[in-house]
Structure formats: structure tokens, C-alpha cells
Amino acid sequence: MFFLTKILPLRGRIFPMFGCLLLIVSLITGCIASPAAEVAETVFDSKPVDFMTFKDSTNTLFLNAEFGDVYLSQDNGQSWRNGVISGQVCPIKKLIKHSFENSRVFALTECDTVYYSYDNGENWDYFTIDHPISITQLPFHFHAKNPDYVIFNNQYCSSSGTWVGKICKPDLYYTKDGFQSDPEPMPVGSSYCIFADSSEKMVVSSEEQIICISLNPNSAARPPFSHHIVYSDDWFQSIVPVQLHNFLGSDGAYGILSTGSFLVAALIDAATRKLFVYVSQDGYYWEEALKFHKGFEFDAFTILPSTEYSFFIDSLDSHPNNPTGILYSLDSESNTFVIRQMNTNRYVDGYTDFMLIDYLDGLQFVNVVENVDEIEVDPQVDKVLSSRITFDGGKTWSTVASPESSCNSMKQCSLHLFLDPHVSHASIASSKFAPGILLASGSVGDRLLSENQMDLFVSEDGGRNWTLSRDGMHLFAMSGFGSIFFASEYLDVINEVYYSLDHGQSWVTVTLDKTIVPIKLFASEDPYAEIFYLLAMTDDGEQSNYSLFSFNFGKFLPKECQFSNSESNKNDFEKWYTRYANGSPICSEMGKKEFFWRKKATSVCSVPKSITDLHGSFDACECTDEDYECNTQFISNDQGECKLLDFIGSLLCASEDLDTFQKIPYRLVPGNKCTPNKRDSHREPQTFNCDSFNEPGTEITSFLYDFDEKIVDVVYLEGTVPEENTFLIGISVNSHVYFSEDEGKTWDKFSKEEFSSVLPHAYNKNSVYMVTSKNIVYFTTNRGKNFYKFKAPSPPNQNGKSLFSFHPSRPAWLLYAGSENCEKNPFADDCRDVVFVSLDFGDTWSRLPSNLEYCSWAKAEKLVVDDTLIFCIRQNTNDPFKKELISSIDFFEYEQDEILNDVVGFMIEDEYVIVAVQDEEGTSLSLDVSINGLNFASCSFPAYLNVHPKQAYTILDSQTHSLFIHVTTNTHLGSEWGDILKSNSNGTYFMTSLANVNRDSVGYVDFERLEGIQGIALANIVSNTKELTDGGTKKLQTLITFNDGLDWSYLNLVGGEKIVPKCGKNCYLHLHGYTERNQFSDPTSTNAAVGLIIGVGSFSPFLIPYEESQTFISRDAGVTWYRIFDSPHLWAFLDSGSIIIAVESISPTNVIKYSADEGRTWQEYQFSEKSKVVVDVSTKPSGVGHQVLLLTTDDENAPISSVLIDFDALYRRTCVFDEENSEESDFVRWVPTDISGKPLCLRGRISSFYRKSIHKKCRVGSSLLVKEEVLSKCECTRADFECDYNYRRLKDGTCVLVSGLQPPDTREEQCSVDDAFEWRQPTGYKRTPLTECEGGVPLDAGTLHPCPGKEDDYYKAHPKPGGWSIFLTIIFSILLAAVAGCILYYYSRRFLKGAIRLGSDSATENPLESGISYTRGAFSSIPIFFSALYQSVRSLFIRSTPTNGEFENAAFLQNYEIDDDDEESV
């Protein structure tokens, strides 16, 4: 029987259809008929998305994404209407329901408006924010207890219309009243925030606590290293930094989130890229979670659903394109990760086949990959998946029991479940109101079959046993209490759907009046509503549409269910225990006998809302062996006994210098509720003797390996985890590759193939790409654990360009610079460069346009541009000898932009994009620079420089927010030198930092920064340039700078006059520089050994030959130097500088020297019987290792032998850092000072660093991460300022306006800042980006003006002076000016040439020059003072209005002659 009701047409977007009331005749004998279903169908011309239902409501909601409208049904889907948001202006893009308040829903637009409803979608309001909304991420973060507390983590993404593409910035807000008032913006610098109380399982101290990742105002690093974690529990009235790590604090904040009862924070150390994970359960107390674990790879783990006592992580463990993982859990007691399952099935986006049934303690499902070995050989192989189940939280796993009748004669037979998190029907349907009842798709056999071979299975005992419910792949759902199962066939055209009233044992067919293709099936979120919704595609012959069916069984269930706490026939509920044996309840794997009430399968009734809690109770069981597992730091052996990990025993013995210690080998499985009995010995501590853990002694060990050919380079894959072995790659002169997995003790040949290139990944320390002569590329992403290969898309280029351009944030993205038609003849007419792009680690390649010569990712670690932006060099179509710089953000599919013409080349250095451009005549070479991606500006060089295209630029670095370049000024072969230029912070104006700096014929420059302390660098100059015009030998001298290239001085050797008594005053210490060093030698300094520098050189007027040189050390960052050896040595820093090794580099030797007191005393270790020449010394690049690798040979062409010397056993105890108790700490605070002992001002501050005390006998290991601590701020000096835009700096430090340019107008920029009411007139100077100085010389303190419309606020802050004050000020100023004028006139006649000059800070000035500079510096501020005075007097009589960039002090500046003809080098 059908009862037809008409569905109202809705504005032409829904086709008029009919609903029907379908009465289904019972197929079951008995006095009670099977219930009917009320069925309604509505047809739409576009696909409904974001479908949602509500608890305790008949309302249903969805989004028509094509038109941006929200549709509402108030009768469980029988009828629909749109336009429910009155006054809607912007199309809706996304619907989001409140996580904890079911009646609240939010509608996101891409405008600046968010609509919201607090009554299940019936009535709507809105709030606006300052910028358009980005829906690439879900912006809302909800409070678990107070629904009115909401955080809105928006990202404002804008496109400048230029080649940079889209750039996103944080745009965060919060509300305390559910957006009844305008949302409050988060503090400036906030990038992501959450509530501490963000889970129903959380227990926090303050409900108002907010935790944020925020920009650290004291950090000059790049993101994420510039960000730290802060919290506030008073709505940002106060903000407290979170101290997670002794040295890092919380710098390097990579992410924060909540899961289960845990807050999780991840930090990345900028120096080592090591990942630190911290957990908290109250938002205040945090504990490191990886303390005894080897660690996870950066950006390769996934946080999974968690419980109140454990949370789960899946970590990548294979090829990223066909990934597998390792499942870990962490519990609230130990805060230590434990491996729970290997070879889990992961997806490229990080999702994992994992399912947790949260209301049943310990019940989880996971799919594992059975053919991992095949995938490691060939990542293209399809995965073979099988399912596992655990009932004890991951301690033990088993296959899923298959239905008894399904296996037939198969040897390996179990049930495998479809758990793909990307597919809505690939899940397990369950409900806490129907405990133990599970509904899932899968297949029976030895593996999970394809979707079209899957069936529908049911379990009624929490996954222990399963039955086949329906054949074929289905969409499925069950009502909240399990009263009704509903299913439709999938992957086919159908006209029938099915429902079951007895937990899937039998099914009733409902025939529809049309054929459909089901898409999704939903059950009502209201557990008391027996309603299902089916979304399907239909076809009326003209076009495909979407039908939304609702099936309402609730009205026709014959009775209301009866519930009582006693089991009887009248009770519609039964008592179900979580585990049975022989029909009787027994203790579960979680140490308790637990039961729930659930509706009987035979009861056909509707559950009243008075029934809310079906959890009965549990009784704790007596503990057995099965309730325990190995404690953290222990591992189970073959006999099932828990044995302490060897490295843990060694670590504990070393850290405390113990003879014995106690540990408890066992612990209860997290969440287990059993009660230990008196005889239970599992919790008793076990005593361990340190002698049994390979106790470190004092023996240094060495390992010799003889190669059969010459090794010319060694590549270290140190990775992100210092505790693990470093993977080494050796490259031979014959193009063979060797590898070592044990730090260099033993080596194996990678293959018989010859390799043309070995390219470490520029941004990923775990990765290297190796290219064979046959264009096969081998690569690893996990530090050599697995190597994969692909075929290069073409032969390599023939002109020396780097083969690969690596992306800084997307490791799978590669650009390849190849060639075609060049192998036989690289000069052939059809030989050309080609460029390819891959987004999947080289599995597939796309060729870019054919006229491109070279391309590079534009995004750098400090350059904020679109991820897809690439720069390319393209041949000019009209002139093949001219080239253009172009860009694209879609790999030239639709868009490209031409940036510059006549380009020679380009490079990206941190935040700078640098392009070399030649003029139209081809006679001069210049640079164009961009730092913001919006425009390029031509660099202004000193007037004396005119660089020919055949001359060389060498980009040195940009670590200090200034670009350092070397411009070659003499190109005579063998006598090359040039000038080092330093730019202002935007890279457009350069001053000469140091002239006549040495370089070699290849282009390398004798310029090297001190690692670990910014602003200090060494350089070698050619002192006899006039003698070399016709050839000759360079005479080199070494200089050092402590203020980032503004001043340079000679090196000070302590006792130098005793070393070379007859040398005289012309002798200084000079060092052999970068151009003379082996390409793979260790650097002069390292970040890990801050302040320590070693070099080979001589105390002489000029640098003498290397073989005649001696070896020197500085322990104070280059201020003073000491001789340590009479001959040249190679060296390396081990254990963060606590051990220094050195070995003779010219003469054959079999002895290595080592020092544990920063080179004050040395001991020797004989590493072989035979003496050989040591050609290279190498160690971990981070400087934290304890091993050093020597490459030795008998003569220049003989095969190489490697000697690994292991100093790991030198000290047994691990150093302890105790910031509070300096006497107990093994580290001392070191403050850099100048030669007089005065603390050095570096970047405007006096800083301290921690180094191991030379008097403490311990090993640093990874216990020390060098961190600078600011002790005090310095007064500002001229070194803290640079020239403002459109100004250039003369050699004396004076900033003058560039001829033809105007001073920058920054009024709008300054006044646009929140709460700004005044703007400051530029003076030509601005603070350098890195300085933190305070007070002192205010060179950037220009005249203040009120912002437009803020005059009242301005004059409140700056009251006008009274009449007498003005009169006295004028009289005093006139007298002072008269005296000053006389003094200035006197000195200017004697010493000055008329320029305004800044006082010099150099300690090398003579007294007369110093006095003159001071006088000039003091009185050069008088014109600015008069300008301010004039402005204050004038404002009494003239209405003050904002100026338009006119500078009144310019008139006073013009009273002085600007010395603008002096652009020489310093």
C-alpha cells in the first residue's frame, strides 16, 4: 500500500517528486507484524555534501556546494527548503558541526563572513573577520566544556598578481560568548591555537587555558624554528612561554594537538633537525615522550585516535609512494612510545588503516602489509593486506576469526576488513548504545580482496567471532541501539535496499520504483531515531541527478522497549559480557569481568529516551601473566622474558656513574584493571650490574678497512636522530659507490655500476640521490635503510648544472635538468637542455616546455612564496644568445610570467632571489634582487665597480639578513682577487666590506663564518695587489670581523713574539683559508663546539706555504689564538667540542692526537702499525659524534684505507646539565669577550653559551644543544644601523640619499598597525634586522607626526609645551648651538671635509681620530634637534597636519657638504 504525499518544489533547484509511505508486509510468522518504513525521495541537480543530522531533533542539513546554499529539512528528510540563511551574501563552501554541542553548526564562506546556527540549522546569525577565509584547513577549535569558547584558526591567503602565487598568513580569533559579540583577534604573531580543555577526557587546571604556536620575538630564525609555544589562562592578559626543553625552550614548534586525554607538542631542533615530542595531560606539566626511543623521522608520523590512557602514532617506515608504517602507543604513566605493530598499511597522505572501538577497552583493528620485502625491491608492486585484531591495547595481535563455513580448504584463512579511512563505507559500524555489535565489509582468505569481491560481515561479541551477513559489497549502517541494520548494494545499478531487525541474521527487501546508483548511506546521529538516509545518482534520460532518500522506521515499531536491571523475558535488554568461555563470562584481556546492557536481537521495539547508560559494571580480576607486558626500556626475548635494552643499561650506568641499579621489568598493560595478588612478583624491581652492559672503559678502539681503489669523497647521512648510526657513502675515483651502516667500520660496494653523481638532498638530512652512468637513479629517504630506484627521464645535462632541484618542504617534488640529442655530440645543433618535474619521488615525470634551459623551485626556507612556484631560464625566441627569467605556478600548463630579460643566471639564497643581468651592450654585469616576491630591484654597487659579464660574482651567504657577495676585480689566472660587498637588509644597496679578498680560479673565496655565533667571519686578503699586475705570487693576510663585516682586524696570537722573535710589529697570525682546503674536510668551526676555531697558518708578515705552517686554536671565537702544533694538522671536533682530535697532514703517521680540555693538553693513540699519509679527516657534520674517520694512503695514486677511531669509551659518565646549580652542572657558561676581557656586543646584545667544563670527565652525547642566552642588551651604535631604502652608505658609515630618489614614505605602513596614533619621519637610517640594542645613538629617531584622524591621541601622548618652557628652550638652544657651532667650525677647519659622519666603534682607531669622530658624532645630531624644536614651536601657531614625506630636517642637513665622491674600498 502506498500513501502519496507531494514534495514542494524549491526555487527550481530541486525537481518536484513524490514521497511515499511504504508498508512492508511481514515475512515473519507471528502475531506482531514487521514494521513499515516511511520513505521520501527528493531529487537535486547537484550533489549534496556535508550532510548532517542532529540529536534530539528532526532537522537535517546539507550543503549544495555548486550554488553555495544550505538546505534544511525539519521533518527527517521528507521535505527540504533552501535559502535558510537570511541575508546570505557569500556562497557557503563548508558546513562544520560543533564538536561538543550537537545543535550548533557553522557555515564557512570564502568571504570574510561565517554564518552559524545554534538551533539545529533553523535560525542563523553571522560574524565577520578582517580577511577572507581559507577553507584549506578546518579553522575551528572548540572547547570541550563551554560551547561558547571557540577559537578560529584562519589563514588569510592572498595573491599579489605577480609570479609568487598565493601566500598565506595566520589570521586567528577567539570568542568567549559564542560570537554574540565580534570575535577578538589573537595576539600578533600567533599562528595556531587550541584550548587545553579540548577533549571530554581531558582534566585541566584552568578551563580558560589556550595554548598557541606563536612567533618568538627574540628569534631571528626562519619558521618553524622562529616559533615557540605559549599559553594564557586569562584570555591573553598575560602570555607565558612554555618551557619544554632545557635549551630549546619551545623554539622550533612544529605542531600542537589534542587526542584522547593527551596534549601533544612537537619541536624540531634547527641544528640537528631532531624531532622532540612532548605530552601533557593538564596543559601545564609537559614530559618528553621520546626520552628512551630512537625517534621518528621529520614529517613522517600520524597521530591516530586515542583513549584516556594511551594514544597512538603511526610512523612511516618504507617508500613514501607505497608506504608502510610502524604503530606505536604511549601511555599516561611512562610517557614512552612502545612498538605495537609492524608493517601497518599507510597511504601517501599519512592516513592509516587503523580502527579503535573506544567504548571497549583494548579493542583495535589494523591492516598490515604482508609483502613488505617485495615493495622494498619494487615500490610499484600492489600491497597484500591482511587484518589484525587486539583485545589488550596492542600487546598481542591475532588474525580476525573468519565465519566457520567460509574457509573451505584454504590453509591460511581469516577475515580481512576494509578499513581505508578515505572511503566512508570502509569502516566498522559500531555504537556505544549497541555494545559488542560490529558491522563491516571484508573478505575471507589469505588477504583482503578488491572491493567487488567483498561481503558484509557481523560480529555480536566485540570482534571475537564473525558471521557472513550478506554477499557482495554494500553500503551499510545501523541505528544507534542496533535495532535496525540497513544496507544497499554498492558498485552497481540497483532498485532494492535491505534492512534487518535481528542483527543481520535475516534481511527484508524494499523495492524502489526506479534504478539508482548508491553513493553514501547515513544513519541518524540521534541514537533514538530509527532513520536512514541514502544518497544516490539517478538518470531520467536527459541528465544525471542526485536523489536523497530518507527511510524512517521509528513510527512503525510496534512497541516501546522495556528495561530492567534483571534478566527476564519481559526485559527487552540482555546482559552482555565482553568475554566468554564455554558460554560463561570470564575475565577479559584488560583484567576485568565487564558487562553491558544491550537490546536483544529478537526484540522489535523503539528505545525510549529515558534509557541513557547501558554500561553495567565491572569486577577487577586477579592479575595473571597475560595482564603484564614488558616495561618501557625492556624487550621480550624468545622465551618471553623481559630483558633490559643494552643501550638503556649503558646509558643509566653512565649518566649516574653507578655500579648497580634497579628497574622493574614488567608493567600492567595500559588500561588493565586487574588486582595483583600477594605472590605476584611482576612488580618487584630487578637489580642490574653495570658490568653486564658492555661497560665503557678507557679503551679507544679503531677499525681498519682497505679499499681496492682511491676514495675521493665521503657523504654523511646523519639524519635527525643523533643516537642512531650514521650512514656513510664513499665515492671512488673510478665512480663506484661504497656504503657503511656502522659509522665506517666496514664498507660494502653498493653495486657494480658506475655513478656519475651523488647528490645529498639539500633540505632532508636522511636523503641522497645517486645517478648511474646509465641514468638509473637510486635514492633513500630513510638514511640508507631502504634504497629505491627510478629511470631518469633523460640523460643529464652537459653544462654542469645541478641535476636535481629539491623542494624545501615537499620531499617528493623534484625538478630534473637533463638533455636530449647530446650524447654523441654536445655541440650538435639539435642538442638542447630539457627540464622535467616529478611530484612522486621520480615515479612519473612531466616534461616542461622545450625552450627551458634550467629550472629551480623558488621557495626557500626563508622565502615565502607559493609551493608550486618555479623559476626558469628560457632562451629568447628572437635571439638564442639572450635569455629570460620566467616563472610559473602551474608548471606552465596555463600560466607563466616573464620577470627579467638579458639574464645570465639566478640563484636563491635564503630569503633572497638573486639574478645576474647584463646590459644591452653586453659590456657590464649587474644584479637584481628580490626579497618579498613582489618585485625586483637593481643592486647599487660602489661607483668604482663595473663588472664585465666574464667576471665573477660569488654569493657568499645571507645568514645575517644581509647579502654578502664577492665581486672579482682581478681575473688574471692564478692571481684572482676581488671585493666582498655587504648589502642592506633588502639586498639592493651594497657597501664595500673588505677589498682585495683572495679567491681561486674556480670561484671559491677565502671567506668563512664562525659557526654558532652570528656576525663573526674570517677572510684572507691579497696584500700585494700592486705587485701582481704582471703576475707573481700572492701574499695573503688573514682578517677577522666581529660586527658582520663593518670592521676588520688582524688575528691576535698570544705569545707570537716568542714564537717568531725577530718578526717585529708587522707580524700577525694568518691562516690558510677555504680555497686551500680539501673539498670534504671538516670546517674551521662547528655549531656544536661554539667559540672553538682551529686553523693552519703562520705568525708572519704574510701567510707562508702550507707545508711550513703550524696549527693554532682559538677558544674565544677568534679574539685570541694559541699555537698547538709546530706542523700542519687535520682536525675534527667530537662530542660537541669536548674532544678535539688532530693528525699530521703532510708526513706519514700512525698516531692520532686527542684533547679533552680544548687543546690545552694532548694525548696520543696509535691506530695502526704502519705509518701512512692521512689525506682526510671526517666526522658527523653536526659535531656530536664520538667517531672520526681517517682516509689514509701510501702515495697519491694508491688505494685508500679507512680507519674508524671510536672515542665512545673514553668517558663513561654522561654529562649533566643543571642550570639552577652551577656547581653540580658539568657545563659552564661562556661569554664572548674582546681582547681586554670586555663582553662583546654581538647583534646588539651580550650573550652567553654553555660549554662542557674542561675539568669534568664526562661525555656530552646529545645532552647539550647549544643555545644562546641573552644576558643584557647593548647601547645602540652605528654598527646597529643600516641605510634606509633609497639611501646608500659611504665608507665612513654615513648614509646619503641616492641621487634622483626620494626618501621612503612609510606613514601609511606605520599608521596601519593596530593602535598606532603616530608615525616617525625616516632619517636615512634603520636598525639592522638582527640587532636588539637599546638606547645609545638613536640614528633612526626621526620627527614624530600624528596619524590621520589620531591627532587627539597624539597630543595626549605629547602635550604641547607651555610658553615659558618654549622661551627657555629657545634661549638655551641658541646658546648651545652657538657654542657647538664654534667648536664644530674649529674642528671642521682643522680636520673635516664637511660630511656628517658617525662615530666609529673600532678599537683600532688612533686617539686623534677617535676624538674627532666623537665630536662629529655628538654634534651631528644638532640639526635634527633643531628640527624637532622648530616643529614644536610651529605647532603652537599653525594647525598641525600630517606631512607627505617632506623632511624638514633636510634643510639643516643641506647646511653640511656631503662627501659623496668617496666610494673606495675600506
UniProtKB/Swiss-Prot annotation:
Q: What outcome is documented for mutating residue 1419 to A in this protein?
A: No cpy1 secretion; localizes to Golgi and vacuolar membrane
Q: What is its main location?
A: Golgi
Residue numbers on the Cytoplasmic membrane side: 1385-1466
Q: Which residues cross the membrane?
A: 1364-1384
Q: Which GO terms describe its cellular component?
A: cytosol; Golgi apparatus; late endosome; membrane; trans-Golgi network
BNR repeat extents: 71-82, 115-126, 388-399, 457-468, 498-509, 738-749, 778-789, 836-847, 1039-1050, 1112-1123, 1153-1164
Q: Which UniProt keywords apply?
A: Glycoprotein, Golgi apparatus, Membrane, Nucleotide-binding, Protein transport, Receptor, Repeat, Signal, Transmembrane, Transmembrane helix, Transport
Q: Which residues lie on this side of the membrane: Lumenal?
A: 34-1363
Signal sequence span is: 1-33
GO molecular function ontology, one term from the record: vacuolar sorting signal binding
Describe its function. Answer: Functions as a sorting receptor in the Golgi compartment required for the intracellular sorting and delivery of soluble vacuolar proteins, like carboxypeptidase Y (CPY) and proteinase A. Executes multiple rounds of sorting by cycling between the late Golgi and a prevacuolar endosome-like compartment.
Which residues, renumbered to this chain, are glycosylated?
465, 545, 986
Q: Would you tell me the protein name for this molecule?
A: Vacuolar protein sorting/targeting protein 10
Cellular localisation: Golgi apparatus, trans-Golgi network membrane; Prevacuolar compartment membrane
GO process annotations (BP): Golgi to endosome transport; Golgi to vacuole transport; protein targeting to vacuole
Which Gene3D superfamilies does this chain map to? 3.30.60.270, YVTN repeat-like/Quinoprotein amine dehydrogenase
